[in-house]
């Protein structure tokens, strides 16, 4: 047995490489093999006694760990090898325990590996096979390895130098063996990496150097294969795709036998995923996160075809990344060869498609379907549990990622397309990121894909070589008469070019769709402007008519799944126009209101290109509304589609686009309207007066929000809502828009009954509740939406009520005069900056005086800090007099007013659901009601004239009849704090020069005095706040879009599905 107290020390090569010593027994020279690394003569310390302190000083970095038996019994382990004394007496195995992989491991990797190497070397010697003797460090070999040289197979350096080809006598096939996993140098490196933090850091630096070296080498590759010689970037695309691989490869373990959670709702804790206490910025978009997830076994042929069918029936019709015929040929080739002969390219593409297809299966009671013996109709097939061999989508994703590096690092195949296939691989990864949170986040994966597509020049197309022969110089000849040169291309070459061009178009518009979809969801700018795109749509024909020899003419009326894809492409173009115009208007307004400086170098008179040809913003908006309706009415029929993709989701996308079109077209407060300088002819109603169409805007927003929620409810009842993360996002956005319109518009309240409002709220919360076990962030969204809906209904019942009782005549009469005056004043005289600031100070003083004279108003406390796990302001909230949990039904007011209709006193379940809204002011009295502000609305972002931008507190009050005039799209009542008005600072004071946020952060309990805000990641007005801290804002979707801890946790259940 080995004894650590042995005075005669002999070190292993690993110990020398690490700079630390581990005692070994002295072996007789006759018994030790000459090639055994542990028997090599290595230099001893000059002073033998100097080695003893070295052992003691390295005890904290020992390579031997306590055994699992002593750990479980909480006994002190003597750490003897190969067995400790306790295990030796008990006669049991003495093994260690890995807390990350949750499995038993050898107590000493070094001892275990050295013993194994010695045994294998002895086998080689017994069979007369020569091999290189191991040395402590081969500098020449290491330089070649780090430089990325291919191993010279069959050379004298042997397996330590690279890859060798071992001939199989039975099938005469070459088996490639990786040097770093099987060679002694790789074993030594692996053991040092696991046991030494310093060596681990050095290894990470080495990996980074390798990627950087690869990027540098690829940057020198000559330009080949691009349609336009002006794009001189990396034509292979590896420099971009490897960034994605570096981020996502850490999501899978190195050993496929390691198992992760078996059930969808079991998630690893932060300590297991390695993301505790880190943010997206800390980990460089998740590059340092290393969660463990097992790899799925390669499915049998029947299961593979069913998973692929699910992908092509439900996912590919929306974003047609993959050519179906080409993919099925790849599947046939893969299953026709031996497992060892399958290429990394085929294994990656097949596994990532299996991952997406497995997520489409939505089932709760698969056993019942099997017991009843239902036939496999399309709907039954989707809900059917495939077999016991079915793995989770994350596990198929893990199996795909382990092959991504080999696929990207190998040369293009004879039947492949090099960089185009690498872009296709990234797009498939983005498609899976729609299904599950994946590091580094959907936003960053799509960004990499867009930049790779632009790098390949896919956005630019001029028809050269196929449609424009006059622009091509290949194979030109002049005739005798000196006529214009003509291009001669044979049919085979033309067919090949048509195939490649359609492939490029397909990938570009898939990348474009991803970019527009994600950017519109999160409210970020696009990766490329529409004005820079000249690429046409791909062919609308079914894939079987698009061959490598050319495009075949399809029969008249032949169905094609691309009808859905084309319809989605058109929608993304419309969404792109809407988002571009709204962001342009917001930026123009911010530049006009902001301090001078950079704007002196900008063209402030330039309007959005999409507004050219329209006399006003409203005319453009009406035109877009008309085009959206035409898009909805021109949706393809199921007979045209030819797949099982439910077309009801197209209508859902229409109403979501309507919300997007109108959510920032809401009115400015009356007091700000007369302080803004006259707008140009083309301006957003958010920055001018919109009294002529205000009711229409609110009504459209409310109708669209209600439609989205009800359609999701209907789809959920038939098990079609499987994109759980996007569904959570869309339902929450639609619900907020619906409540917002009710809060601010008596006209909307007059068109709705309390039962209709209650049904819509119940539909949203019920779907979110059902999605919770598949999408954990849905719980926080549901809780927040429930609280906001209760506050909205309570406020409405205490003021105007719902239905015909709402007196619109009085509301409109009381506000028309003031608006007419404000509109006239705003258009009649231009205001200087000094005059505007003076009027703002005067109006702020008047509002302060009004608030001091008014009675205290109820505070809306949504308890949002409970949703986000931040309880630092719980004590403050408990003492602030916030509304508690109200269980009593709404008490009918006893005050009577013949001129003010109130809801009837009958009880119904809807009224029992909501608690009382305690309004201290009688409805008929002209007492002021609060003007609720959304402290970071687009109108106020960067505006020095905004009181809310300075204090985050509602600055003034108005009568109940004026509360339909909001400041901008948002949850303004969340930050309402009437007690903080007197703390408001004057806009002209020096203390307020930095526009610090005060009231809102305190009410949310997230660090008073800092502008953290609530970044829901939804692209709403809350998202326009400036983040002055290094802390990440709240993210209800747990890193779905932007990575972070939530993007690396495995096992969220089935979440992909039929509609995005």
UniProtKB/Swiss-Prot annotation:
InterPro entries: Transcription_factor_dom_fun, Yeast_MetPath_Reg, Zn2-C6_fun-type_DNA-bd_sf, Zn2Cys6_DnaBD
Signal peptide: none
Ranges annotated as DNA-binding: 67-94
CC per GO annotation: nucleus
Keyword list, A-Z: Activator, DNA-binding, Metal-binding, Nucleus, Transcription, Transcription regulation, Zinc
Localization in the cell: Nucleus
One Pfam family it belongs to: Fungal_trans
Task of the protein: Mediates the induction of a number of unlinked genes involved in purine utilization. Binds to the consensus sequence 5'-TCGGNNNNNNCCGA-3'.
Protein name as annotated: Positive regulator of purine utilization
Gene this chain is encoded by: uaY
